[in-house]
Amino acid sequence: MDSASSNTKAIDPPLHMLGFEFDELSPTRITGRLPVSPVCCQPFKVLHGGVSALIAESLASMGAHMASGFKRVAGIQLSINHLKSADLGDLVFAEATPVSTGKTIQVWEVKLWKTTQKDKANKILISSSRVTLICNLPIPDNAKDAANMLKMVAKL
């Protein structure tokens, strides 16, 4: 298992199960990629919209968690526009950036682009999302060490 894959498994098991790998982890930018495989497609052999939504909320939550000083965060609203489809075999790139990082509420923008394995330079926007998160929640006792792996992987 390569380092990017093992990092994804450690910090976001659901995304790991789909084949997602993180590239950059910081309080101001989260990026990664997903090869569109049968496990993340709907019956028409295109990326399932729910997978795009999962990526959006996961990346925004991770960024908000870091930007809030590793406080507990929770998504309270997700809006996603599916603009184009990504076909089986395409490669999807994801980027989450903060729009607003307040002490209580954060808003993150998440964009997904597709490329083909043959032409990685030609990126086409497939979805655009806004994720609103509450970011001042208490951390329960059973999750006190939840941020440790993310801090280690992000080298923070």
UniProtKB/Swiss-Prot annotation:
UniProt entry keywords in alphabetical sequence: Hydrolase, Peroxisome
UniProt motif (Microbody targeting signal) ranges: 154-156
Protein localization: Peroxisome
One cellular component term from this protein's GO annotations in UniProt: peroxisome
One Pfam family linked to the record: 4HBT
Main location: other
InterPro entries in alphabetical order: HotDog_dom_sf (IPR029069), PAAI_dom (IPR003736), Thioestr_dom (IPR006683)
Domain of life of the organism encoding this protein: Eukaryota
Pathway listed: Cofactor biosynthesis; phylloquinone biosynthesis; Quinol/quinone metabolism; 1,4-dihydroxy-2-naphthoate biosynthesis; 1,4-dihydroxy-2-naphthoate from chorismate: step 7/7
Expression (tissue specificity): Mostly expressed in roots, stems, leaves and siliques.
Gene Ontology BP annotations: phylloquinone biosynthetic process; protein homotetramerization
Annotated active site: E57
EC number: 3.1.2.-
GO-annotated molecular function: hydrolase activity
Subunit structure: Homotetramers.
Miscellaneous notes: May originate from a horizontal gene transfer with a bacterial species of the Lactobacillales order.
Functional description taken from the UniProt entry: Catalyzes the hydrolysis of the thioester bond of 1,4-dihydroxy-2-naphthoyl-CoA (DHNA-CoA) in peroxisomes, a necessary step to form the naphthoquinone ring of phylloquinone (vitamin K(1)). Is not active on benzoyl-CoA, phenylacetyl-CoA, succinyl-CoA and palmitoyl-CoA thioesters.
Family: Belongs to the 4-hydroxybenzoyl-CoA thioesterase family. DHNA-CoA hydrolase subfamily.
Name of the protein this chain belongs to: 1,4-dihydroxy-2-naphthoyl-CoA thioesterase 1
